[in-house]
Amino acid sequence: MKRIAIIGGGISGLSAAYQLEKARATGAGIEYTIFESSPRLGGSISSERVEGCVVEAGPDSFLTEKPWAAALCKELGLGDQIIGSNDSQRKTYIVVHGKLVAMPDGLMCP
C-alpha cells in the first residue's frame, strides 16, 4: 500500500486527490491524506455573497478552448453549473481604499 501526503487543499491538491481517488476505484493500493492549514479547502478560490452579489476570489474562470477543464467539470457533475461570460459586461475591478475601481480594458498584471 502506497501512502501519499498531499500538501495543501487548493485546486492542485484537490485535483491530485481526485486523480488518486480514481486510481483507488480501479484497485490501486493507495492511501492519501490532504494536509491543509486553513479551516476550509479551496486555497485562494472562494465565493461569497455580499448584498445579493456573488464575489469571487482567486481564479474564477477557465478558457473553454481548453476542453479538459470543461470535461473535468462535467465528470464532477458540475457541467450544468458552467456559466458563460457576457462579453458586453466583462470588466475587471479592484478595491482601492474600500471602493471598486474599474480596470482599463486590456490591462495585464505580471
Placement of each model-derived feature along the sequence:
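Beta1/beta-strand and adjacent pyrophosphate-binding region of the FAD-binding site
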Residues: 1-12
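Conserved SAM-binding loop
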Residues: 5-6, 34, 61-62
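Gly/Ser/Thr-rich beta-alpha loop segments that engage phosphate groups in nucleotides
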Residues: 10-15, 44-45, 60
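Short, solvent-exposed loop/turn segments at secondary-structure junctions
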Residues: 11-12, 39-40, 108
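Hydrophobic residues within alpha-helices
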Residues: 16-20
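Glycine-rich FAD pyrophosphate-binding loop
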Residues: 21-50
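Dinucleotide-binding Rossmann-like beta1-alpha1 core, especially the glycine-rich loop
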Residues: 51-110
